């Protein structure tokens, strides 16, 4: 059977069994989630090895990041699913008193899930949790740029699910294009804005709803008087995690001009402690760039910025043989340089000086609405002004990633950084059709 034929056959099977899944209660959905959890637990070492093979992720990196993120989503859904599935009463307006109004949550149907390469385990399986919890079926394509992890994800899905409920398809762009020929009820995509546009255009042919988790230039903004040691340490952690190949990474940092030098010194000291021993970069501590194309892209950003007057205060070395870009810090970067117009997605941190907050908010607004924003300030007026004059998918104040890590907060982007929300209850709602129901007279008898 050809890949195209299998796609058509599985799609037809899942569509034909939609009513069966819709009739199933919380117990059946919870059983599927438990099967997924068991399949993950039995392959922890294989997941770790795959992440190292694909990205040179540090030993135990998966156990400290991607794996608990997925397991946490599963456990939360198992514990809350009965409550989430319950019809939600809606107050009846005065005009319609005596009638019954409520919202029923029904599955969207057959969902296409397209995973990403940068966190290839979590971004293939974390969205699958609300898909299953909401009673949908899914056809999952892990990302081909992380082939070892794609293989393990496929093994997990095949072990946990019947193909009529969740099926997996490995392969390259041609597989993604073949999948998108089918009229899915919903499409869930994580990746770049450029590819997101193509996914949305393909979905539009069938009027499929979409969830797009994209990215953008996520800024860190440090206020005057804020603890530089605290801010610098957290910015470094958020910029160089996974070698900057993270949609939530700090893309660049705005710092008051009076303290930019000490800020950069602290950043340098933190980087030395995190990634170096006796002045030598420890490759096992820094993931590699995913491929040569992305290596060349990020190196090109550095070269173009330096050619236009930017100054390297740390790093700058690039080893194409190992796909390693040393943690790099730039200052005096022109705002119209490519590195300031495009999402970096690599281990490079431009540090920008400012004297007037208006300058910062105007530039953030000019770059589009990012997926995340990080504000470091002890002044409520400063925080309020930034929030008023900018927009982003989410924001964390005086820390990094926390709005993503809190499972009860909806996570997602806005406009160029994405659309739709997931995590926890928000994910269940996103992957459900909220069906408005009105019963004349308030009751229906058999």
Regions from the language model: what does each represent?
Residues 91-230, 354:
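Rossmann-like NAD(P) dinucleotide-binding subdomain of oxidoreductase/dehydrogenase enzymes
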Residues 25, 324-446:
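Conserved C-terminal structural/oligomerization subdomain of aldehyde/semialdehyde dehydrogenase
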Residues 29, 74, 135, 166, ...:
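Residue-level signal for inorganic ion chemistry
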Residues 7, 26, 44, 228, ...:
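Residues at or immediately preceding the N-termini of alpha-helices
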Residues 161, 194-334, 357, 397, ...:
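ALDH superfamily catalytic-core signature
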């Amino acid at each position: 059977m050809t890949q195209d034929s299998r796609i058509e056959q599985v799609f037809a099977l899942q569509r034909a069994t939609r009513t069966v899944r819709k009739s199933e209660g919380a117990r059946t959905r919870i059983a599927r989630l438990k099967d997924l959890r068991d399949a993950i637990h039995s392959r922890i070492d294989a997941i770790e090895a795959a992440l190292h093979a694909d990205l040179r992720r540090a030993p135990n990196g998966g156990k400290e990041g991607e794996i608990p993120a997925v397991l946490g989503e599963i456990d939360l859904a198992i514990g809350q699913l009965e409550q989430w599935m319950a019809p939600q009463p809606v107050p009846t307006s005065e005009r319609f008193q005596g009638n019954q109004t409520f919202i029923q949550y029904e599955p969207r149907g057959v969902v296409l899930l397209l995973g990403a390469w940068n966190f290839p385990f979590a971004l293939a399986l974390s969205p699958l949790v609300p898909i299953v919890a909401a009673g949908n079926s899914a056809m999952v394509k892990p990302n081909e740029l992380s082939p070892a992890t794609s293989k393990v994800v496929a093994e997990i899905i095949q072990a946990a699910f019947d193909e009529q409920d969740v099926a997996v398809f490995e392969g390259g762009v041609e597989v993604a294009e073949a999948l998108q020929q089918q009229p899915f009820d919903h499409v869930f995509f994580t990746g770049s804005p450029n590819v997101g546009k193509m996914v949305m255009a393909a979905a539009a042919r069938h009027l499929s709803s979409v969830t797009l988790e994209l990215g953008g230039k996520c800024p860190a903004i440090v206020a005057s008087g804020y603890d530089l040691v605290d801010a610098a340490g957290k910015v470094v952690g958020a910029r160089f995690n996974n070698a900057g190949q993270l949609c939530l990474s700090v893309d660049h940092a705005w710092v008051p001009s009076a303290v930019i030098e000490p800020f950069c010194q602290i950043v340098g000291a933190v980087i030395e402690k995190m990634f170096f021993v006796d002045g030598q970069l420890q490759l096992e501590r820094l993931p590699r760039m995913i491929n040569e194309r992305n290596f060349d892209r990020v190196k090109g950003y550095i070269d173009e910025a330096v050619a236009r007057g930017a100054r390297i205060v740390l790093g700058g070395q690039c080893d194409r043989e190992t796909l390693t870009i040393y943690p790099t810090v730039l200052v005096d970067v022109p705002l119209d340089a490519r590195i300031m117009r495009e999402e970096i997605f690599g281990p490079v941190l431009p540090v920008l000086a400012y004297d007037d907050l208006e300058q910062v908010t105007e530039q953030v607004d000019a770059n589009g609405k990012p997926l995340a924003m990080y504000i470091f300030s002890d002044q409520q007026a400063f925080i309020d002004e930034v929030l008023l004059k900018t927009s982003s998918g989410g924001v964390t104040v005086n820390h990094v990633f926390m709005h993503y890590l809190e499972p009860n907060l909806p996570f997602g982007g806005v406009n160029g950084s994405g659309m739709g929300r997931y995590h926890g209850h928000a994910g269940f709602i996103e992957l459900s059709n909220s069906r408005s129901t009105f019963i004349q007279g308030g009751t229906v008898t058999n």
